[in-house]
Amino acid sequence: MEIKHRPTMLMILDGFGLNSNKEVNAIAKAKTPHFDEIFKSYPHTELAASGLAVGLPEGQMGNSEVGHTNIGAGRVVFQELTRISQQAKSGEILENPELAKAMNNALENGKSLHLMGLLSDGGVHSHIEHLKALLSMAKSKGLDAVYVHCFLDGRDVPPKSAQKYISELEDFMTELGLGEIATVSGRYYAMDRDNRFDRVQKAYDAIVNRKAELFDTAKIALDTAYDKGETDEFVVPCCIKTRSAEGSKSQGNICDGDSVIMFNFRPDRAREITRAIVDPNFDGFDRGAVRNNITYICMTQYDASIPNVGIAFPPQSLSNTFGEYISALGLKQLRIAETEKYAHVTFFFNGGIEEAYPGEDRILVPSPKVSTYDLQPEMSAFEVTDKVVDAIESAKYDCIILNFANADMVGHTGVMDAAIKAIEALDTCVGRISDAILKADGQILMTADHGNADEMLDENGNVMTAHSLNPVPLVHIAREPLALKDGGKLCDLAPSLLDLMGIAIPEEMTGESLIKRG
C-alpha cells in the first residue's frame, strides 16, 4: 500500500518584502483577499533578509542566490561578495594562484588580459571594487595590455547610473596608468540566463569578434544609447576605441592565447557568455573563428560542467543542508519553480550542488518568452500552481519547496501597474495552494528571500528596480497553526521546517527554530 504523506511546504514568494509605506509598495496597492485573510488568520512575524543576517556586508540588499543558500543551509553562509571583498581589501587577493595564472600567461606570452563583468556596486553579481583590485594586481605584475569589457547594470542599481561607474573606472585606470574600456554591453545581452542566445551573440560579437558599432569613448556610447531610449540594462553591445598595444593583433577584443578573468561572482548569469568563449562544443550560435588557448578564470564556480576554466574562489562546501539531511532520512521532497527561479530552489537551496538527492523530485515550469515580464506579470504562476496542487493531492511528498518568481521579476521592471497585477495573480495562486494544503492536513511556512515589489520607488520618487532592504514575512498556515518567535532570519527557516516535521535539527544548522511550542 502506498504511504500517504502529510505535506509540509516552504512557499518562497521571491521579492515579497514588508513595507509600511503604501505609496511605493505594489503589494499594498494590490487587491489581495487571500493574503489579507492569511495575515489576519495565521501567526506571522518578520525575518531579516539582508546584510549580516545573510552573510553579506552590513546594509547590502539580499538577493535570490544568497537567500536560497541561507534558507537551505540552515546557517548564515558567508557570501562570495564578503569573502572576495575582504581579500581585495587586505591584499590577500594578490596571492590568488588562479588570478596569478591568468596574469602570468599574458605577461610571459605578450598577450592581453581581459577583465569582464558587471560594472556596478550593486553587490548582487559583482562589485566594482573587485575590478579595481584586479587592475591593481595587473599593474603590480607589470602588465601593459589590459582591456575591460563592461556589462552595464541598471537593475541592482538605478536604471541610468552607468556613467557614474564608467567615470569611476576611467579615473581609477588613469591614476593607475593601466587599463582601458574595450566594450560596453547591457546586462540584458551579456548576462542572459535563459538560453536566449540571440542576445548573448550580440555581446560575444563585440567582445570577441569586435563586430559592433564603434564609439570614441564609453561616455559617447552611453549618451547615444540614452538618446535611443535605452537604459543601462538594455544598452546594445558596442565597441570602444582603444590605444592598441604596439604590434598586437588585438584592438581590445579577445584573441588566441589571451587571458580572461570574468569577475562576476554569482554563477547563474555568468554561465552562457563563459560557455560561448571557452566550450569547444558550444552550439548556441555561430561564433565565427573560435578562439584557442584562452586562459579563462571564473571568479567563482559557475557550473562544474564548464570546461577549460580555472576558479579563483572555489565553492565552500556545506554539509547537511536541508535537502541532503531529509534525503538521508528517506523522506520524499519536491522542488518546483518556473525557469527564472528554478536554479534557486535546486542548486542554490542545495548549497551549490547540481544533482538532486535521492527522493528529491524536481519540476521546472518554463517562464514565458517575453522580453520583459511587465508584458506578462502573471508569468507562469498559474501553471506552477496547477502542478503544485497536483503534487499535494498525490500525497507523495513529505516536503515541498516552492518558489513564485512574480514579485521579484516583475518588480525588476519598475512598472508599478504590472507589479500590482503580478501580486494579484500571486494572491489567487496562494489561495488555491493554501486550500489544497489545508485539505490534505498539511502546513505551509510562507516567506520570501528578499524584498522588491514592496519598494517600487525610491525616496525621491524615482523608479526603483533593485531589491529592497526590507524584512520579509513568515507565516505558519495550518489547521492548528503555531505561534512564531520574533527576531529571526532566513537561516532559521530550515530548522523551523524540521521542527514542524518533528525531525531533530542537525548540529551543522546553527539557525534556530522559530516555532513557539507550549
Please tell me what each predicted stretch does.
Residues 1-518:
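Feature captures the catalytic ectodomains and active-site-proximal regions of enzymes
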